[in-house]
């Protein structure tokens, strides 16, 4: 980043913002890069501002019982805020004085007042000087206030982030990620946007008092009639505002519903295509869109009339102010023109400035109170550790995630009674529901010595992770004692990858040691994976490691934990995503050898791990079921396997599991109603974290945090994002960032939002932060590439071949300090940081975009013609009236008037007061009627255009190939449907209308003035040219700066979400200061862009004012020097001159706004033009032997079942299959060829990242593929894409549950009857689950079905496959993180419901793979082996290495029996006995 010219700029350069000229010049000539942005002033750095505010806040906390954040802010910023307020007031005072001088100039041309003619020149000079002073006062004051607002936002951003890292886990469970993002964006944005208006809360009343005094002097008591009109108008606008709020509140719910489904569709687009649900979801989203648009139109009409009322209120104010005076004393020209000028200023103060100021203070104080409440929440308390101890001891420890569970039950029950919910199933309330808080851990005792391995096992929800959290201090024990040294390293169950390189993720701020680092990556089996990357371990991992496989992410997380030199290592199920062979090698080489001298606590369910552990702790429902050695376990608890793993009846699961379902159901159904939203909560302890539920608790989706294939943050945000205050009465309209404020104008010149809303609505609707941390398999992140400082690398004296056998921790480094990041972020890092965020959109919207937008709907062209014709009528009427009245002799003085309202601003003279009044009323009423209704058709049609574009974009995305969608960010796609569509719905119609109206007003006024004084036309032309050239010059740079600012905004929220997901890891490693410094870097980067944008904007506004001053000087002196007698002509010219230039300035700003908003249209068009999947057959169709074409071809998404349909057997032949993720990319699979017999079961084998899941996607034609696949003799090139995919039943690795009823999730097209659905639900074990909920099949699942466990969701996918009647079933890791109960149900269903189907299984559990007849071994993207299980075991193969001797002994009887009996059917597989289950897995 370059050094800012501001540091060496002179006072004059700072006053006129001339120091921004270099960046403006460069932006006009070429495309700006992040390296072109200037460094921020040191006073604006996040470190300095946060330290200053934190010091004052700490002082406030220490000195008072009720600390106030506003007091801390006052001590930091009050004096500068007051200074700029006084400057702003002086600038506004000049506006009140200008009409007085204008009146004196007009009066000097009165034939009866020739004495003052000599001082007209001096009065004109004074009037021009007032404009100069006003320009020099207002712009620095406004910029200074914006600057202070920016500094306040930065300081509070940092304070909130630091507080977030300190919050206790219990508090984090009560706060959703959407609330935190809302706190940082919607609330803090108010300081940036509104601080410049805050002073008008006292300036406006003073200005009104001054103006009314001057009007009293001018018109006496009749002046108050005009004020009364303004007050009535303000009340009228307030009524309109309430109507808009009403429609917005209703509309917000519709937007939320649409965006929930849209975000779920985008996040699970691969599953949508696999299920062939494109049409069903498109219809569902369009239905929500229709309801939304009805309310959008109503809100737009109200806003339009509200805006029109302001435009045309000038007529009423002037008319009613002058009418009483004119009827009594006649009309005086000087007083007419002076009154007009006074009323313009008065109208702005009463109807705009003061209401805006009040709203600003209301919003700002509300935001400060929310932040204040957040800053006082309970913090994480570090436990006191004994650094000299070497043992880990727990003595009768009991802990609660959340106490008083029964209170939630009683409250929900009372709410249900009050609401008289009749469809609540009484069986939902189990008799054994505890009225006391349920401990997550109770009476836990154990002791492990240094160097021992403790294996922790237990069923799902037994409290294994909670045990680790308690050791780390995240969960405070209510009873008992915990003793250890406090030097902990932690590996989470769900791998967490921070933005940065592979090496940075592993060393994680710890001092670098080459020997230790190489040992760790070798022990964690990362050497081969790292070697495949071009940049090796310097490869930047973005999106939480989205470019890595799940196994690679898990191994990097494990390597991070192992690399740190600690006394205690907590490993929470680190092998969940690893294949059997890799898991075995890592456990032996890393856990058992490399860490042999370290104390380890490993959460596992593998029998092999238990056998090698020094001690075993088995948990059951939070209690210690067993503690001791493995031999003691076998002797004392011979039934531990079946007892803990739940191989008894599925319907008789524990009361604790049932209570989990109840609690979540009550939370969703009773307390939060339709607004309750949450993410998938798959851990039992998350059900216990209920928190304090307010009846009006609203939740949100992340906006706009950009992501590559997963959604942040950002932005999905189906619900309005409120602050942390649960009981906030803030309206939905104010909270929902997707719905732009009618007056704020998101994305246009004066304002800026700090989050891509809508989406913005990035993810986390009501999921607590705690659940976010425990379900972070889809971590988000930006490609922030940070350079690390050089560290001293110690040379290893040991042979490299024996690295893993050395004790890598015996040579402790001199320091374990965090990684230094004190150097500046260099240009290369900045480019890489935003590589994925840069949009390929021109700096200025092209004419082609405007032309295409106009032609989207043919009616729009006719509407534009209508608007132009109406305007011509107005201008023609003004000119005709002017010509008629110009014949009236000016001798009839004393009766002068104004003939048009503010829209035409034409002033005429008449011969009598009554004649004047008739003309004035008649013409103004005509213009008023035309003006009020000429814009309605335009607004209506533009909303229709938005509807058409949304439909086209939705269809394009749903029909786009995955190869294209893989290159797009999910957050970017969601922003198109949220933020950009909101702009097309709300801002663009009225902004376009305002621009057209203002432009036509200027043209009309110039035409009128040119007729009166042709000389002025000569001055007008160069001024208009100057405006156009200045606009073009500024626009090139401003739009690029705006885009860079938007790109720099994303890392702030991405870093917040990333930090929250890895918060337990951060605390365990003590890296909070490191991440605070990174957060400040992201803030400083955004500040550099935003500060430069504000400065260049003020440069542009000031130049516009300067051109206006020059023009007004020219017009003033031309009119004075060339006009003889006649005060009317001078009044017309000077008044119109002021009106032309203020209107032209407004029109130029509106044109910039339109160009900025049209960028959203460009982005939408970009998605509309996405290529679609090739759905038509590319070959002639091969008819079946019976010659019936209907058996091969059916219409897509046919809702009528057909019994006799292809495929019939499930035979599958693959020939030379090659697959790529994107066009032109590397081949992921090469020359795959094999065949599968009907009803056969095939297992896919290979290391993590070898391409097993990719092969399943290739079967579904979700990738770019070459080669051929045939099913029952029918090639995939001879039938439609939809029909091909319908041949497969799919259970994906990532479960997809969209927001809707159970029935819709199982049967979105409505093909099956309730009896058939219940039958299938019974087969897969879902019936007992569905019957627990009110409404049963009609119960609405939200937020990915958070009330269901992960196993229940897998059963939903299984039920879909059964209903689809598919002959080929694809299963991708169906048992990953699956509880044993559900796993056994899936195995049973596969053997029964799919007995005659072909099954292709990708699985890491050995017992599931043993049931396959053949195995396909994939290695290095190619098929290495494809053979029977006997052949694979008889030779050296990957499968043989993965199978333990005990498994082989069990397997050979199956093989022997297979020689005598056909095993082509799954039902022929031998059922495993309970003993076999016990020996295989916990």
UniProtKB/Swiss-Prot annotation:
ATP 2 binds at residues 1221, 1246-1253. Pfam families: ABC_membrane, ABC_tran, CFTR_R. Residues 423-646, 1212-1445 form the ABC transporter domain. A motif (PDZ-binding) lies at residues 1480-1482. N-glycosylated. There is a cross-link at residue 688 (Glycyl lysine isopeptide (Lys-Gly) (interchain with G-Cter in ubiquitin)). Residues 1388-1482 are annotated as: Interaction with GORASP2. Glycans are attached at residues 895, 901. The keyword Ubl conjugation applies. One of its GO terms (cellular component) is apical plasma membrane. GO terms for biological process: bicarbonate transport; cellular response to cAMP; cellular response to forskolin; chloride transmembrane transport; intracellular pH elevation; membrane hyperpolarization; multicellular organismal-level water homeostasis; response to endoplasmic reticulum stress. Residues 1-77, 147-195, 244-298, 359-859, 941-991, 1036-1096, 1153-1482 are cytoplasmic. Gene3D superfamilies: ABC transporter type 1, transmembrane domain (1.20.1560.10), P-loop containing nucleotide triphosphate hydrolases (3.40.50.300). Residues 1450-1482 are annotated as: Disordered. Residues 81-365, 860-1156 form the ABC transmembrane type-1 domain. The chain crosses the membrane at residues 78-98, 123-146, 196-216, 223-243, 299-319, 340-358, 860-880, 920-940, 992-1012, 1015-1035, 1097-1117, 1132-1152. Monomer; does not require oligomerization for channel activity. May form oligomers in the membrane. Interacts with SLC26A3, SLC26A6 and NHERF1. Interacts with SHANK2. Interacts with MYO6. Interacts (via C-terminus) with GOPC (via PDZ domain); this promotes CFTR internalization and thereby decreases channel activity. Interacts with SLC4A7 through NHERF1. Found in a complex with MYO5B and RAB11A. Interacts with ANO1. Interacts with SLC26A8. Interacts with AHCYL1; the interaction increases CFTR activity. Interacts with CSE1L. Epithelial ion channel that plays an important role in the regulation of epithelial ion and water transport and fluid homeostasis. Mediates the transport of chloride ions across the cell membrane. Possesses an intrinsic ATPase activity and utilizes ATP to gate its channel; the passive flow of anions through the channel is gated by cycles of ATP binding and hydrolysis by the ATP-binding domains. The ion channel is also permeable to HCO(3)(-); selectivity depends on the extracellular chloride concentration. Binds and hydrolyzes ATP via the two cytoplasmic ABC transporter nucleotide-binding domains. The two ATP-binding domains interact with each other, forming a head-to-tail dimer. Normal ATPase activity requires interaction between the two domains. The first ABC transporter nucleotide-binding domain has no ATPase activity by itself. Belongs to the ABC transporter superfamily. ABCC family. CFTR transporter (TC 3.A.1.202) subfamily. This is Cystic fibrosis transmembrane conductance regulator. The lineage of its organism: Eukaryota, Metazoa, Chordata, Craniata, Vertebrata. The gene is CFTR.
């Amino acid at each position: 980043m370059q050094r800012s010219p501001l540091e060496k700029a002179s006072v004059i350069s700072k006053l006129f913002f001339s120091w921004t000229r270099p960046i403006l010049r460069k932006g006009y000539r070429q495309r700006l890069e992040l390296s072109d942005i200037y460094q921020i002033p040191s006073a604006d750095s996040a470190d300095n501002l946060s330290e200053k505010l934190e010091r004052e806040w700490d002082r406030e906390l220490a000195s008072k019982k009720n600390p106030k954040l506003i007091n801390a802010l006052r001590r930091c910023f009050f004096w500068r805020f007051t200074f700029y307020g006084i400057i702003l007031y002086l600038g506004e005072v000049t506006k009140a004085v200008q009409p007085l001088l204008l009146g004196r100039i007009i009066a000097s041309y009165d034939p009866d007042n020739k004495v003052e003619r000599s001082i007209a020149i001096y009065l004109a000079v004074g009037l021009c000087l007032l404009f100069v002073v006003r320009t020099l006062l207002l712009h620095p004051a406004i910029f200074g206030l914006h600057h202070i607002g920016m500094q306040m936002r930065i300081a509070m951003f940092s304070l909130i982030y630091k507080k977030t890292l300190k919050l206790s886990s219990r508090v984090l469970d009560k706060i959703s990620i959407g609330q935190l993002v809302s706190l940082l964006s919607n609330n803090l944005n108010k300081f940036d946007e509104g601080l410049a208006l805050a002073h008008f809360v006292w300036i406006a009343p003073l200005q009104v008092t001054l103006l009314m005094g001057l009007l009293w002097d001018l018109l006496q008591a009749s002046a108050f009639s005009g004020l009364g009109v303004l007050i009535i108008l303000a009340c009228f606008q307030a009524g309109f505002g309430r109507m808009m709020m009403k429609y917005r509140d209703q509309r917000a719910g519709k937007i939320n519903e649409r965006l929930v489904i849209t975000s779920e569709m985008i996040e699970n687009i691969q599953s949508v295509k696999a299920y062939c649900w494109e049409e069903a979801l498109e219809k569902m989203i369009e239905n929500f869109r229709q309801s939304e648009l009805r309310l959008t139109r109503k809100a737009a009409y109200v806003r339009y009339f509200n805006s029109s009322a302001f435009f045309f209120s000038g007529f009423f104010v002037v008319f009613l102010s002058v009418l009483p005076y004119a009827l009594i004393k006649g009309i005086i020209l000087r007083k007419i023109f002076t009154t007009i000028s006074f009323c313009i200023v008065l109208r702005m103060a009463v109807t705009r400035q003061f209401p805006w100021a009040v709203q600003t203070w209301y919003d700002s104080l509300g935001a400060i109170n929310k932040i204040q409440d957040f800053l006082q929440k309970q913090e994480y308390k570090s436990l006191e550790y004994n650094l000299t101890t070497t043992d880990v001891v727990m003595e009768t420890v009991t802990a609660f995630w959340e106490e008083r569970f029964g209170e939630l039950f009683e409250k929900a029950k009372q709410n249900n009674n009050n609401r008289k919910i009749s469809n609540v199933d009484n069986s939902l309330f189990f008799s054994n529901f505890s009225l006391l808080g349920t401990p997550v851990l109770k009476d836990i005792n154990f002791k492990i010595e240094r160097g021992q391995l403790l294996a922790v096992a237990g069923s799902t929800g037994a409290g294994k992770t909670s045990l680790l959290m308690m050791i780390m201090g995240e969960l405070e024990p209510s009873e008992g004692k915990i003793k250890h040294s406090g030097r902990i390293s932690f590996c989470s169950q769900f791998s967490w990858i921070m933005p940065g390189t592979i090496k940075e993720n592993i060393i994680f701020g710890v001092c670098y040691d080459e020997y230790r680092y190489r040992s760790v990556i070798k022990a964690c089996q990362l050497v081969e994976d790292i070697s495949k990357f071009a940049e090796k371990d310097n490869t930047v991992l973005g999106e939480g490691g989205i470019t890595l496989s799940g196994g690679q992410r898990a191994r990097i997380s494990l390597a991070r934990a192992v690399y740190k030199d600690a006394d205690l290592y907590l490993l929470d199920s680190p092998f969940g995503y690893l294949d059997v062979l890799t898991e075995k090698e890592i456990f032996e080489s890393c856990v058992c050898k490399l860490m042999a001298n370290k104390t380890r606590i490993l959460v596992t369910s593998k029998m092999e791990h238990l056998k090698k552990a020094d001690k075993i702790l088995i948990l059951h429902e939070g209690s210690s079921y067993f503690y001791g050695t493995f031999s003691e376990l076998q002797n004392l608890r011979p039934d531990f396997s079946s007892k803990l793993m739940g191989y008894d009846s599925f319907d008789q699961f524990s009361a604790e599991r049932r209570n989990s379902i109840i609690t979540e159901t009550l939370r969703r159904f009773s307390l939060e109603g339709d607004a309750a939203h949450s993410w998938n909560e798959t851990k039992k302890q998350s059900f216990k974290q209920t928190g304090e539920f307010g009846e009006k608790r609203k939740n949100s989706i992340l906006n706009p945090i950009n992501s590559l294939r997963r959604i942040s943050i950002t932005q999905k945000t189906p619900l309005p994002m409120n602050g942390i205050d649960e009981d906030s009465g803030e309206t939905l309209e104010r909270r929902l960032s997707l719905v732009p404020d009618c007056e704020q104008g998101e994305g246009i010149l004066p304002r800026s939002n700090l989050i891509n809303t809508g989406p913005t609505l990035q993810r986390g609707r009501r999921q607590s932060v705690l659940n976010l941390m425990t379900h972070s398999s889809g971590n988000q992140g930006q490609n922030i590439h940070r350079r690390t400082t050089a560290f001293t690398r110690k040379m290893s004296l040991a042979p490299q071949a024996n690295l893993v056998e050395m004790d890598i921790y015996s040579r402790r480094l001199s320091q374990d300090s965090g990684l230094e990041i004190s150097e500046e972020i260099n240009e290369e890092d900045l480019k890489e940081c935003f590589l994925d965020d840069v949009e390929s959109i021109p700096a200025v919207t092209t004419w082609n975009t405007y032309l295409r937008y106009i032609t989207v709907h043919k009616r729009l062209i006719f509407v534009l013609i209508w608007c132009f014709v109406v305007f011509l009528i107005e201008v023609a009427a003004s000119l005709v009236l002017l010509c008629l009245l110009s014949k009236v002799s000016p001798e009839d003085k004393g009766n002068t008037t104004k003939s048009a309202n503010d829209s035409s601003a034409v002033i005429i003279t008449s011969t009598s007061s009554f004649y004047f009044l008739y003309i004035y009323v008649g013409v103004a009423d005509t213009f008023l009627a035309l003006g009020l209704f000429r814009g309605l058709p335009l607004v209506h049609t533009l909303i229709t255009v938005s509807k058409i574009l949304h439909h086209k974009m939705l269809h394009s995305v749903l029909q786009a190939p995955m190869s294209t969608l893989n290159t797009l960010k999910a957050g970017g796609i969601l922003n198109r449907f949220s933020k950009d569509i909101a702009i097309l719905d709300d801002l663009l119609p009225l902004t376009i209308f305002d621009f057209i109206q203002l432009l036509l007003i200027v043209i009309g006024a110039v035409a009128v003035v040119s007729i009166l004084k042709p000389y002025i036309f000569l001055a007008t032309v160069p001024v208009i040219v100057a405006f156009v050239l200045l606009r073009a010059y500024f626009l090139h740079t401003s739009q690029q700066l705006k885009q860079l600012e938007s790109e720099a905004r994303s890392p702030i929220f991405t870093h917040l979400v990333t930090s929250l997901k890895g918060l337990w890891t951060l605390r365990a490693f003590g890296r909070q200061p490191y991440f605070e410094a990174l957060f400040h870097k992201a803030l400083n980067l955004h500040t550099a862009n935003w500060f430069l944008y504000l400065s260049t904007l003020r440069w542009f506004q000031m130049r516009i004012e300067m051109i206006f001053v020059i023009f007004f000087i020219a017009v003033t002196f031309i009119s004075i020097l060339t006009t003889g007698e006649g005060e009317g002509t001078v009044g017309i010219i000077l008044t119109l001159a002021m009106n032309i230039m203020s209107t032209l300035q407004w029109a130029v700003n509106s044109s910039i706004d339109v160009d900025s908003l049209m960028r959203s249209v460009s982005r939408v068009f970009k998605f509309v033009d996405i290529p679609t999947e090739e759905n038509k057959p590319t070959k002639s169709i091969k008819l079946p032997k019976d010659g019936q074409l209907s058996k091969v071809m059916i219409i897509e998404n046919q809702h009528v079942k057909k019994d006799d349909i292809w495929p019939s057997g499930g035979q599958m032949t693959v020939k030379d299959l090659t697959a790529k993720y994107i066009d032109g990319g590397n081949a992921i699979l090469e020359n795959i060829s094999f065949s599968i017999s009907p009803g056969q079961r095939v297992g896919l084998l290979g290391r993590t990242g070898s391409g097993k899941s990719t092969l399943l996607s290739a079967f579904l034609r979700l990738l770019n593929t070459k080669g051929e696949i045939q099913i029952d003799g029918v090639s995939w090139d001879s039938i439609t894409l939809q029909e091909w995919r319908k041949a497969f039943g799919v259970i994906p690795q990532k479960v997809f549950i969209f927001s809707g009823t159970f029935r819709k999730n199982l049967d979105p097209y409505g093909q099956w009857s309730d009896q058939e659905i219940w039958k299938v639900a019974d087969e897969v074990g879902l019936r007992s689950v569905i019957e627990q909920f009110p409404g049963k099949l009609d119960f609405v699942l939200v937020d990915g079905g958070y009330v269901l466990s992960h196993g229940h969701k897998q059963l939903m996918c299984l039920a879909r496959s059964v209903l689809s009647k598919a002959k080929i079933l694809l299963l991708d890791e169906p048992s990953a993180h699956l509880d044993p109960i559900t796993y056994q149900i899936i195995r049973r269903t596969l053997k029964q419901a799919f007995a005659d189907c072909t099954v292709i299984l990708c699985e890491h559990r050995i017992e599931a793979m043993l049931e396959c007849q053949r195995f396909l071994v994939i290695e290095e993207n190619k098929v290495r082996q494809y053979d029977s299980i006997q052949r694979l075991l008889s030779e050296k193969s990957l499968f043989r290495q993965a199978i333990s001797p005990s498994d082989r002994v069990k397997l050979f009887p199956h093989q022997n029996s297979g020689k005598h009996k056909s095993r082509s059917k799954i039902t022929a597989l031998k059922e495993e006995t309970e003993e076999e289950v016990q020996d295989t897995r916990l």
